[in-house]
Structure formats: C-alpha cells, structure tokens
Amino acid sequence: MDKKLYPRIGEEVIWETLDNGLPVCIVPKQGFSRKYALFATRYGGMDMRFRLNGQWLDTPAGIAHYLEHKLFENEDSDVFELYAATGADGNAMTGFEDTIYLFTCTENYAESLKILLDFVQDPYFTQENVDKEQGIIGQEIKMTMDLPNRKCFFNLLGALYAAHPVRNDIAGTVESIAQITPELLYRCYYAFYNLHNMALAVAGNLDVDEVIAICDEHLKPCEDMNLEVKFPEEPSLPVKPLVEEHFSVGVPIFSIGFKCAPYADDVIVKKEVEANILLSLLAGKMSPLYK
C-alpha cells in the first residue's frame, strides 16, 4: 500500500493495486459526512476500432455510451432501485476516453460500494432490452441536437478533425446506434471492462481496510487482455478554419480550437492549466472581450 501525503493542502492519498490487477485510490476525509466512489474503465466514445487477441473490430459511434446505459439494467433488478434502498445517489458518465460509474451517500457506504462493484461486473444484454434502449437514446440524441452549446462544441471538433473519432458525438447518431446488437455489446464489454483496464477511487470518512476487503470479496479475478485501440491517420491542419450555424439564441456562442500534436501524459495536466489561464485572460468574465 502506497501512501502519499500532501501537507500543503492537508490531504493523504492511498494507492493499492489489488491482486486482480485493479488500481484503487483512497482519499480519507476525516470529519466529512458524505462519501464517494467512482468505478471507471478506459473506454470512451472515441474507442471505436480495437484489436483483441489479434482480431480487429470496428464499432458504431455511440456504443460506449450505449453500454453505460445498459449496465444499469440487470436481469432481475434495477440498479437505481438498489441504490435507493441504501440511500445512495448513483450516476454514470461517458467521455471521449473513459466511462465512469459513481455514487455518493452519507450512510450504508459498504452496501452501496458492493452494489457498484457488482452491477458493473454483471452485463445483461438481450435483443429486447437493446431494442428498447435504442428508442430511449435515440430521443436523447434528437434532444441534444437542439442544444446550441453542444452543437457549437461538436461543430468545432468537426472543423478540427478530418477522421479521428473524437469528432463524433459521444452518444452517436440515431443511425449508428441502430447497428448495435447484444453480441456487439458483449464483445466491447469483455474487451474494455477488464480490471486491468479499470480503476476505483473512493473518498470520505471511511475504513480503508474495509474498502480493500469489499473489493477482494466482490471483484472477479480476470486475466489481462492484449487490447489495442487504433485511430485513423489525421492531418496536422484543421479541416475548416470556420464553421457557422444559426440558432435562436439571445447571445452568440463561439468556440476556438487549436490543433496540435499529442502530449505525453506527464505534460498534459500542465498544458491544460496553461490553456485555462490563457483562455480566462482572453475570454473570461474579466476580459475586455467578455465585457
């Protein structure tokens, strides 16, 4: 168990890699009433082409988000009902690079953590429930098409990238999700929902040994997968310098993007901070442009 102290901010972070390969991050918060847990996998909206055990598979846009939705529906229960019984507030989110399942609570933390670990490891996909979800997510996609901020953001990505799947909406399109089948969901699940490709983070006034014991009891051992994700070749320059679209909004919305080569992991955080400072200076609430 690796403990790191941050005296300047009064924090302690505990790291432990379990025998099953899952890295666990624990942040003790003495005196806090609310507790948190996040169970995440490195699988997001742009991971559309991957190779597992030598076989390449191309998947439709939106399948990672679709899979996130379907995991909440088990064969004999609804996960939100299980959380309601413990008083926990559960949720999930799919990003470009990851999918995160989380809950917060003030009591019954151990029971809620068991629910989280169990349902994420228990996929249940049938043709009937997959077809039902297509209608639900299809309506969600149609609703987001009318959101100016979201539309502006993905117009920017479409102007920057010619082929990289980051240009696609994480939820996909009505047409792309119609291609999703139970078999395809299972293949994506067993490729990416592997404990060696996942992480657990917990925080709050909790018992560290109890958290580790629950993980050891409820996590299923698995072998590391020979998984490779591939992205298409991308030109260095943007596709278009400008994209305009008219919406009925009171205040114009704009986004600016800079296309650059990928940074190493240890540089990304620094570059993000630099970019946020620069953007605040250029277009923040105290900037001449905003005023």
Q: What is the predicted function of each stretch?
A:
Residues 1-79, 186-290:
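His/Glu-rich zincin catalytic helix
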Residues 75-188, 209, 289-291:
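Acidic/histidine-enriched segments that form metal/cofactor-coordinating
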